[in-house]
From Swiss-Prot:
Protein's UniProt name: Long-chain fatty acid transport protein 1
Gene behind this protein: Slc27a1
Listed GO biological process terms: adiponectin-activated signaling pathway; biotin import across plasma membrane; export across plasma membrane; fatty acid transport; glucose import in response to insulin stimulus; lipid transport across blood-brain barrier; long-chain fatty acid import across plasma membrane; long-chain fatty acid import into cell
Species of the source: Mus musculus (Mouse)
Annotated signal peptide: none
Record key words, sorted: Cell membrane, Cytoplasm, Fatty acid metabolism, Ligase, Lipid metabolism, Lipid transport, Membrane, Mitochondrion, Mitochondrion outer membrane, Nucleotide-binding, Transmembrane, Transmembrane helix, Transport
EC number assigned by the record: 6.2.1.15, 6.2.1.3, 6.2.1.-
Amino acid sequence: MRAPGAGTASVASLALLWFLGLPWTWSAAAAFCVYVGGGGWRFLRIVCKTARRDLFGLSVLIRVRLELRRHRRAGDTIPCIFQAVARRQPERLALVDASSGICWTFAQLDTYSNAVANLFRQLGFAPGDVVAVFLEGRPEFVGLWLGLAKAGVVAALLNVNLRREPLAFCLGTSAAKALIYGGEMAAAVAEVSEQLGKSLLKFCSGDLGPESILPDTQLLDPMLAEAPTTPLAQAPGKGMDDRLFYIYTSGTTGLPKAAIVVHSRYYRIAAFGHHSYSMRAADVLYDCLPLYHSAGNIMGVGQCVIYGLTVVLRKKFSASRFWDDCVKYNCTVVQYIGEICRYLLRQPVRDVEQRHRVRLAVGNGLRPAIWEEFTQRFGVPQIGEFYGATECNCSIANMDGKVGSCGFNSRILTHVYPIRLVKVNEDTMEPLRDSEGLCIPCQPGEPGLLVGQINQQDPLRRFDGYVSDSATNKKIAHSVFRKGDSAYLSGDVLVMDELGYMYFRDRSGDTFRWRGENVSTTEVEAVLSRLLGQTDVAVYGVAVPGVEGKAGMAAIADPHSQLDPNSMYQELQKVLASYARPIFLRLLPQVDTTGTFKIQKTRLQREGFDPRQTSDRLFFLDLKQGRYVPLDERVHARICAGDFSL
């Protein structure tokens, strides 16, 4: 019997015994016995262990909701909120560029963004128009999207790693009327210039040699220098539910999609991070993440824009300079994502690691296997791990430092934040349905797909989707919690324990079935990486002709050709089940990652274990010999012909 059922039964028994005329003490004792016997003691245990956590989480939820309500009623937008911050502390440092040493005060950021707003208004851009921004992370990046927002123009924030077809695709799908690019991106723009429409205006910001100037490009900086720096005389008439900018998905599973970020979503993400981890006005945040993604530009820069913190930017993460920057700029909060923490652990031990003032590291993707090693080596007291995607409505946060957890949902107040793990078909990753057509919720310990109930009138539960309607529709399921409702499908598999803590398992498609067992790519990657001294590893499943399921394949960074596959295999046998050990190995100079340090597997999966597709060293696990053997075209042909036992 579940706790609510046990509670109902105990109340009923109490009423019945009282009705029969027994003393109230007997009735109470009997009711308590019924409650405990029905499993209610588990509920009491959960309450005792999680009440403090849940009440703090509830206070954060209420605080963010009240702040959003106040701003909505006032007709505020993100630029309005920033301007209030700038008026309050004009001379405080807003942004610091660690690469160049350039510092911008709040007054300077406000002035620059005003110039951007006035210039594009003068050029005829109207509220709702789109301008693509394509430059590395530096103060100008923030000033550009903020200034465009002041004019009601939507910025499409392009990934600076995009080239050729993906770059042209993202520009095309954004419906941008203009492109602002940094001088450092001129070559990339030149590669796609013929694919871009002639009506697309181009502006270049930053250093650019005369030989690099494209024929149809205007130099932005001189134009901004001549533009008025006062606020626009007429506000664009936007609100918290209007579009602020587009952020593109990482593209780990195909071409990027443009996720819509409205003003209230920007506020919500930044505010949840601020209050969940008790950030302070005096904090200095170190942000070495890409500004074209939400972690760097909303969770990080949002602390500057909304709450007035100083944010130190570094356009590209550097493991060797990370702690030096933190010491130099007196940083108290740092951000991480993906594999950053592992890269830091690979660095030689230095004294500077212990001279910093960092009290909080906030981000996502810290593997449980290195969580405690990271905190102990670098002396960071608090880890603020969270789960969320730019567009999702089911973000969660680890607010009390539970090792390995990416967040929680209350087991007591389950309806306060309507998210759920639901059972899915392991092959198709489609939600399973019960006899009434509703999704089947998972019990504690059961992995399931994370979903969030959609309510477009609630800024904490709305789903704004993507520029592409078809992409938006693919992320929505109906009749999930109850008949006729709608829910956002995260695409991620998590598992929840009895206390409501959630643990990230896999992104949909990051498991494969082999020998009748489900293999988690993330778990195998963590084991291999640890065995190899935190080396970059990508694990994925590949189809073998005539064989059911997918065989495991591991791509391992081996730039100096020093890895001995069979020495590694001896260790693998001690720590991985036989079905989880990779059948194929690919040793390559480096493993491709996205701009947010997520492993890029699309090309690797497409090329599979075919030696004709790559010049990298390939190996095959010959089970009869019990060792990895080189995989050439002859061995490949024999595998495809079924000559080997797999």
